[in-house]
Amino acid sequence: MSMSHINYNHLYYFWHVYKEGSVVGAAEALYLTPQTITGQIRALEERLQGKLFKRKGRGLEPSELGELVYRYADKMFTLSQEMLDIVNYRKESNLLFDVGVADALSKRLVSSVLNAAVVEGEPIHLRCFESTHEMLLEQLSQHKLDMIISDCPIDSTQQEGLFSVRIGECGVSFWCTNPPPEKPFPACLEERRLLIPGRRSMLGRKLLNWFNSQGLNVEILGEFDDAALMKAFGAMHNAIFVAPTLYAYDFYADKTVVEIGRVENVMEEYHAIFAERMIQHPAVQRICNTDYSALFSPAVR
């Protein structure tokens, strides 16, 4: 039988079943009935003269033929989605730019980074979404986002088709309400309970490692992703809290808050992550080519 032609709808349904791990999951994603999906898969199997899946418990696992077909199908549909993305953003009267922001990052710094994407006289429709680095990376790989601003880079050798550009980094400071602890920094961190960024963030993990390296026996009262909320909660409980040193410009204006120490070797990092297909996107180019050195300059006491 000649295989010079193939029904790409059948291949598309197979691709979804493989990714979802079940017919039911693919049916829900495609808003179709499981019976419809099953019929399409059978038609493709007849065309290819072989089984694409085998049963494993209640789910499915691909056969050797299924693995082979998926590798090609994944490249095909990923490439077609990239084509549609590029065509769509070129045709939009307002340039659509979907950005995911890691929820642990400083909103002030992120807003300044995103400001580079906006140019007077060039229409743009910016849409921002907050989530964890892992969730945003998954959405980026599914073409649901154009770029991610995150606190950690990606390894391009491990994440095929994705690129990471370092935007900048800044040190962190420890703050508390007056009066400050009596002991010098960093020993004073043992005098009061601490509020730190969540340990699922890169900065949170760095701080925990730093406490250990300093031999500090600290008590963690809470973990917060939002610096403003951390500051407010810290004031209520007389706790020491952490914020980027750049926030000093604001905190110095608050006479009730005092900076008790800085850690210059524990940095909060900022990285722009995007797919290869977005390299020519004007907003991506502007963000990646902007000089942010002034933005990340440390505050002066």
UniProtKB/Swiss-Prot annotation:
GO MF terms, alphabetically ordered: DNA binding; DNA-binding transcription activator activity; DNA-binding transcription factor activity
Protein name: Transcriptional activator protein NhaR
Keywords: Activator, Cytoplasm, DNA-binding, Transcription, Transcription regulation
Keyword Cytoplasm (UniProt): yes
Function of the molecule: Plays a role in the positive regulation of NhaA.
Family matches, as InterPro entries: LysR_subst-bd (IPR005119), Tscrpt_reg_HTH_LysR (IPR000847), WH-like_DNA-bd_sf (IPR036388), WH_DNA-bd_sf (IPR036390)
Family recorded in the similarity comment: Belongs to the LysR transcriptional regulatory family.
PANTHER family: TRANSCRIPTIONAL ACTIVATOR PROTEIN NHAR, TRANSCRIPTIONAL REGULATORY PROTEIN NAC-RELATED
Principal location listed in the UniProt entry: cytoplasm
Subcellular location: Cytoplasm
Any GO CC annotation of this UniProt entry: cytoplasm
Residues annotated as domain HTH lysR-type: 6-63
DNA-binding region residue numbers: 23-42
Gene Ontology biological process: positive regulation of DNA-templated transcription initiation; regulation of DNA-templated transcription initiation
Signal peptide feature range: none
